[in-house]
């Protein structure tokens, strides 16, 4: 069943805004500056805008969320950003997540406006539209699909994948079931995006990532709080405070990097990779060679470490471990398909092998026990060594 849907229909320039809390509201100038920024950042027209001030300091600094609302119809998607603003004289300078100025301004902001934990996380952000040749060549994930995230519910529970990748760039999946408690996929700082303080929450993580959770009921509201992986965020629900529609209680889980929505396909969440189908809401997920379709059960294995891999024998059963980086070395046991392995280092000059999706490589990974397996049969999220060369 289709779940959250949001798309756009009106012009930003003529729409109202909301500023909260009232105590911070000396700000037609601030709200106007943020609203103008929404107009340039939004990728589609909106049904309204919100400028939600979370923290301010003597009307010189402000931090909050900016939202381009969606109409309450199917297949509609709101957009939202965290922002920081600084006033010099009568002029406000506003930066959104993903702007080059965002980590700079958040670093300069007083502690009462942007906390030290927030500054540390925001320092990892880089512009979504990279200007340098290096970043332009490798935008966003840049061929590295590691997230360090778990699925957004308790480890050991199984929830249903009720909607495959969907959204503007297929950045979202829908999940339902279990005990209904939605938990942080990774440690970070917590924010509620809508002025209602309901429904849509965001956790900003390290490495430029953030995760969004929509339709929540009974969500926490402590904006700026530091959350650990697995901390409670809210319950599955049908809230549409920022627009769109929902049928049946679920969480609409989305992935972002450097302030941009990014396709969730191929990224690892809870030791599963989700892949696109021929249409939105379709697709499937893989854990090693185990495949589930829409409506299938996703067991939460927990996060995959950044120097770990998942054995994917491409349907071939247990994988033979070798005493060195090649098939010509002695066999020293096997490792099960779907097993998590810890990688000590890698060698790029082993024998060549071809794994899933035609991935061919001569790289072999040395495991923590000293044995070796081909990277062709190890999902790590990148074709490069994850723990250096041997």
Language model: regions and residue ranges:
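Zn2+-dependent peptidoglycan hydrolase active-site motif and core
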Residues: 184-220, 241, 245-250, 351-364
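Surface-exposed, glycine-biased beta-strand/turn segments
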Residues: 113-199, 229, 284-317, 323
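A structural signal for short beta-strand/turn segments enriched in small hydrophobics and glycine
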Residues: 161, 188-190, 224-239, 338
């Amino acid at each position: 069943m289709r779940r959250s849907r949001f798309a756009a229909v009106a012009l930003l320039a003529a729409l109202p805004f909301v500023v909260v809390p009232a105590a911070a509201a000396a700000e037609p100038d601030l709200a106007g500056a943020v609203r103008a920024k929404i107009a340039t950042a939004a990728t589609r027209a909106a049904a309204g805008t919100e400028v939600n001030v979370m923290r301010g300091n003597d009307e010189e600094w402000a931090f909050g969320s900016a939202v381009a609302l969606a109409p309450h119809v199917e297949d509609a998607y709101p957009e939202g950003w965290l922002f920081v603003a600084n006033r010099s004289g009568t002029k406000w300078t506003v930066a959104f997540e993903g702007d080059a100025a965002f980590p700079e301004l958040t670093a300069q902001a007083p502690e009462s406006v942007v906390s030290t934990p927030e500054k540390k996380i925001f320092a990892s952000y880089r512009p979504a539209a990279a200007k340098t040749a290096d970043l332009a060549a490798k935008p966003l994930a840049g061929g590295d699909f590691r997230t360090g995230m778990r699925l957004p519910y308790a480890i050991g529970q199984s929830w249903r994948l009720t909607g495959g990748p969907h959204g503007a760039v297929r950045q979202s999946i829908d999940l339902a079931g279990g005990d209904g408690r939605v938990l942080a996929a990774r440690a970070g700082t917590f924010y509620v995006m809508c002025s209602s303080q309901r429904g849509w929450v965001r956790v900003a993580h390290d490495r430029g990532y953030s995760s969004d959770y929509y339709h929540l009921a009974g969500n926490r509201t402590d904006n700026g709080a530091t959350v650990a992986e697995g901390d409670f965020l809210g319950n599955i629900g049908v809230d549409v405070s920022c627009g769109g529609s929902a049928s049946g209680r679920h969480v609409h889980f989305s992935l972002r990097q450097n302030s941009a929505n990014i396709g969730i396909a191929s990224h690892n969440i809870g030791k599963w990779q989700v892949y696109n189908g021929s249409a939105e809401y379709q697709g499937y997920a893989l854990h090693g060679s185990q495949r589930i379709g829409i409506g299938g059960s996703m067991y939460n294995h927990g996060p995959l470490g950044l120097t770990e891999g998942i054995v994917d024998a491409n349907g071939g059963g247990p994988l033979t471990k070798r005493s060195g980086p090649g098939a010509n070395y002695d066999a020293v046991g096997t490792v099960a398909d779907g097993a998590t392995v810890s990688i000590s280092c890698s060698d790029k000059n082993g024998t060549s092998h071809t794994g899933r999706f035609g991935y061919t490589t001569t790289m072999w990974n040395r495991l923590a026990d000293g044995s070796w397996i081909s990277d062709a049969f190890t999902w790590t999220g990148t074709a490069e060594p994850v723990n250096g060369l041997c």
